[in-house]
Regions:
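Terminal, low-structured helical/coil segments at or just beyond the last alpha-helical repeat
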Residues: 2-4, 29-38, 126-157
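Helix-start (N-cap) detector for alpha-helical repeat units in TPR-like alpha-solenoids
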Residues: 38, 72-73, 106-107, 139-140
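Canonical tetratricopeptide repeat
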Residues: 77, 111, 145-149
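Structural marker of alpha-solenoid helical repeat scaffolds
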Residues: 67, 101, 134-138
Length: 157
């Protein structure tokens, strides 16, 4: 191998490592972090969700959804707010829509898996755990969180 070829291979390897690292470190709730900059209702809904004002967050997310019905992050956040209101049917509707829009949305797979556990459906939670195992190239927080939730659901061995 020539010196130039070796340097090129090294550069390509470093670029690949950087790409995979950025994928693994991405925030699951923000596959499009610019939506909060573009839409005041979405940003305000996220702020209310951070304060655990789930009903207020839902109202603002619904307004933002009129403008961005096909936004996976928005659907995921709506599902999370509905889940915390214990409105599981609506939570599942939005989580499924997020996954339909972005089948690799790690946050949606984690959150829907946790919602299935809250409704006693371990088998469905395990399906989303399997999806996360396929999605996460490197270990990811969403996979670990859902594994932990399933272990807690099962109880001590």
């Amino acid at each position: 191998m020539t010196r130039v070829t070796a340097q090129l291979c090294k550069a390509l390897l470093l670029a690949a490592i950087a790409t995979f690292a950025s994928i693994a470190a991405a925030d699951p709730d923000e596959t499009d972090p610019d939506l909060a900059k573009r839409d005041a209702d979405y940003a305000a809904g996220k702020a209310l969700a951070d304060k655990k004002d789930w009903a207020g967050a839902v109202l603002l997310f619904e307004r933002a959804e009129r403008r961005y019905p096909d936004h996976a992050d928005l659907q995921n956040n709506q599902g999370y707010a509905y889940r915390n209101l214990k409105q599981y049917d609506l939570a599942f509707l939005h989580y499924r829509r997020a996954i339909e829009l972005d089948p690799r949305h790690r946050g949606a797979h984690e959150y829907i898996g946790e919602a299935y556990l809250l409704t006693g459906d371990l088998a469905s939670a395990q399906r989303h755990l399997a999806a996360l195992k396929n999605i996460c190239v490197l270990p990811c927080e969403e996979l670990k969180d859902l594994e932990r939730a399933i272990a807690e659901y099962r109880g001590p061995k």
